[in-house]
């Protein structure tokens, strides 16, 4: 009913716009930019030199100058992306097709003079995928899942990379037309208002409606040779769109894994229904120079874009999708239903950030970890191992830094370097609050119930005041929760996790623990050398049983892995692949040991290291066991 109503209202607006003639001398108000949708278009049938032409038609301005911007920062990345860098041939045209004077203020902003005569803006957009040199967050290029792809078979349209906003029209509605070959499959959760075919039938133009610029940035699109599957999770329709350039992986096979996981998530969440549709966009990258290298995902309120290597085996891809998508799907709780004014009124040029990344990312990551044991997808020992991994990783960060201070200043050093800790210590903060609430309520309340209560109070259209959240949580829960937040989240005191584990009858011990082939219990066993641009093993390799048994020594330099040469530009892709190795796989690794080539050709065996292990106390009391049961299965 709401969709129909919006479509009807929008159609009425369009009729008004279409019946008015837009000229510089028009004195009526029905063509003013402030009352009309900004009409935008992308034409994928007219790509030239790997650039998509974009047209922006804003309506009539009454001011002499206007400023148009593409985002410097987009939500969810917590880093500078500068999407204006990828714009070429920027032109502002008057009603006669003549160019108006423009001034580029910075990488992302243009001021247009004589704006009362502005008819439209045109420019071309380069994509980001094929110029990436490294992956990850904080580099010269945007993190891959927030980036763009322009390829004859696939278009990743993170729309913040193509469409911008006027300073004076941030809350204006948008109309978007995307023209593409008729043979393309197209998916987006953005409200579609119509489809029109070209006269010769070779192209289709899909029209979309966005209530404001936020909805443009929050609704990515996939176009091209896609494999699409749909399934239902409660009242939520899940749309899975997969691009596998060599058809190695299918949406049907991935759907089976996603459906099982997301049904479990929905069971865990219960009555949280904050969106009728959720989209998963999976781009599987080839192993070549022009492929994206930043593997991971970027959440949107009702979708996620995932980038992973196409070469991953089925089992490894399934494991990665469970870990990545489970985290992103839980964002329908926060920030979709619970968020601050900084999120709700996000400034894409000079953003301010909430103090509460521990909640947005940390609690979300905690849910993505806890629900798997709650729903029987992993064993309790596997869950404990994941928690220990987060503790070990967080110990390598600045454990005495105020988490709220770090969150609020996440774009600048020394805080930016600590960003990864939101997924480690942030999740552990969520765990501690959960255990405290279970203890205080005799097992009846936990952090999920708190988030549901906050969601009911606020919801997606009502932001909370950032400075008041901790006080509010304290009043909604228990004094012990408020004291914890003030001491360990606002304050600089490191958390003693043993205090919390003891409440549920667990303890940390030293023993032989399983590890993978690039880490010892969460600690990387390589020491990358940027001066020599090589990746040697560190001293830690001596404590990794697989490599030690195969004669690898500290200082041995990785040269080739399964025939692929390792360099700084290929390192993330190759080492990510090594992280996914499983016992039984045949491998061939070539090392350089002081100029001598060392070849290791063998079958992987399980690797072990000496490390910390979280396990159940043999003398745990009935009270501790009951609290543990409520925590893990509540």
Task: Pin down the residues of each PLM region.
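C-terminal motif of bacterial Sec signal peptides marking the signal peptidase cleavage site
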Residues: 15-17
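Early extracytoplasmic/domain-onset interaction patches
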Residues: 26-73, 158
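Non-catalytic architectural context of zinc metalloproteases
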Residues: 82-89, 93-275, 293-296
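C-terminal recognition in membrane/secretory proteostasis and scaffolding
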Residues: 368-369, 377-634
């Amino acid at each position: 009913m709401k969709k129909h109503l919006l479509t009807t209202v929008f159609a009425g607006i369009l009729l008004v716009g279409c019946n008015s003639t837009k000229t510089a001398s028009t004195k009526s108000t029905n063509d003013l930019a402030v009352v009309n949708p900004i009409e935008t278009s992308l034409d994928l049938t007219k790509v030239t030199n790997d650039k998509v032409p974009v047209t922006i038609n804003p309506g009539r301005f009454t001011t002499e100058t206007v400023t148009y911007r593409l985002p410097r920062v987009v939500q969810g990345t917590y880093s500078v992306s500068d999407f204006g860098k990828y714009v070429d041939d920027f032109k502002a045209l008057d009603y006669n097709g003549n160019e108006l004077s423009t001034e580029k203020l910075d990488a992302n902003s243009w001021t247009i003079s004589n704006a009362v005569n502005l008819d439209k803006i045109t420019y071309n957009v380069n994509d980001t995928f094929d110029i990436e040199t490294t992956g990850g967050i904080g580099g010269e290029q945007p993190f891959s899942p927030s980036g763009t792809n322009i390829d004859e078979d696939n278009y990743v349209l993170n729309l913040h990379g193509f469409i911008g906003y006027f300073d004076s029209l941030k809350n204006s509605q948008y109309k978007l037309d995307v023209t593409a070959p008729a043979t393309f499959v197209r998916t987006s959760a953005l409200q579609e208002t119509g489809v029109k075919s070209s006269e010769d039938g070779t192209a289709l133009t899909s029209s979309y409606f966005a209530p404001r610029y936020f909805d443009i940035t929050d609704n990515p699109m996939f176009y091209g040779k896609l494999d699409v599957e749909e399934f239902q999770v409660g009242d939520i329709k899940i749309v899975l769109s997969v691009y596998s350039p060599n058809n190695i992986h299918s949406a049907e096979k991935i759907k089976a894994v996603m459906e099982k996981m997301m049904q479990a998530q929905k069971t865990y969440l219960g009555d949280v229904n904050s969106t009728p549709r959720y989209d998963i966009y999976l781009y599987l990258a080839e192993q070549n120079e022009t492929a994206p290298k930043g593997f991971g995902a970027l959440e949107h309120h009702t979708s996620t874009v995932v980038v992973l290597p196409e070469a991953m085996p089925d089992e490894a891809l399934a494991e990665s999708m469970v870990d990545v998508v489970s985290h992103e799907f839980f964002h329908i709780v926060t920030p979709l239903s619970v968020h601050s004014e900084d999120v709700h009124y996000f400034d894409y040029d000079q953003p301010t950030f909430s103090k509460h990344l521990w909640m947005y990312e940390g609690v979300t990551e905690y849910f993505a970890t806890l629900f798997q044991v709650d729903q029987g997808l992993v064993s309790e020992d596997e869950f404990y191992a994941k928690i220990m991994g987060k503790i070990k990783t967080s110990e390598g960060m600045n454990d005495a830094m105020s988490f709220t201070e770090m969150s609020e200043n996440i774009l600048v050093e020394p805080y930016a370097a600590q960003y990864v800790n939101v997924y480690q210590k942030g999740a552990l903060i969520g765990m501690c609050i959960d255990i405290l609430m279970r203890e205080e309520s005799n097992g009846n309340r936990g952090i999920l119930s708190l988030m549901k209560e906050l969601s009911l109070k606020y919801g997606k259209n009502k932001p909370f005041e950032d400075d008041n959240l901790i006080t509010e949580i304290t009043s909604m829960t228990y004094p012990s929760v408020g004291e914890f937040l003030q001491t360990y989240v606002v304050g600089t005191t490191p958390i003693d996790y043993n205090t919390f584990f003891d409440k549920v009858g667990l303890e940390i011990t030293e023993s032989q623990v399983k590890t993978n082939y690039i880490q010892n219990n969460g600690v990387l066993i390589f020491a990358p050398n940027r001066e020599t641009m090589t990746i040697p093993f560190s001293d830690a390799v001596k404590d990794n049983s697989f490599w030690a048994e195969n004669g690898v020594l500290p200082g041995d330099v990785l040269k080739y892995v399964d025939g692929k040469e390792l360099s700084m530009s290929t390192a993330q892709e190759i080492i990510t692949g090594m992280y996914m190795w499983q016992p039984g796989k045949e491998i061939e690794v070539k090392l350089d040991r002081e100029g001598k080539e060392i070849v290791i050709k063998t079958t992987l065996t399980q690797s072990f290291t000496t490390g910390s292990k979280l396990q159940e106390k043999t003398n745990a009391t009935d009270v501790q066991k009951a609290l543990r049961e409520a925590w893990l299965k509540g």
